[in-house]
Amino acid sequence: MEISLLNIIACPLCQGQLLLQEQELVCQIDALAYPVRTNIPVLLVSEARNILVK
């Protein structure tokens, strides 16, 4: 995924900043990790993984 894309996309839930970590885009505000599949970010809340440790 192109790093310049990170400057124009945002979390679909809170419109916060997304951080690229491995093959995921992480929203630290919502504690969600959105997958990146074949260099395409999947910014669907239903596809996001909760990253909170319980």
Curated annotation (Swiss-Prot):
**One family name in Pfam for this protein:** Trm112p
**Organism the protein comes from:** Baumannia cicadellinicola subsp. Homalodisca coagulata
The protein, known as: UPF0434 protein BCI_0256
Q: What is the lineage of its organism?
A: Bacteria, Pseudomonadati, Pseudomonadota, Gammaproteobacteria, Candidatus Palibaumannia
According to the record, the signal peptide region is: none
- SUPFAM superfamilies in the record, alphabetically? Trm112p-like
- Tell me the superkingdom of the source: Bacteria
- Which InterPro entries did the record assign? Trm112-like (IPR005651)
Q: Between which residues do disulfide bridges form?
A: none
Q: Which family does it belong to?
A: Belongs to the UPF0434 family.
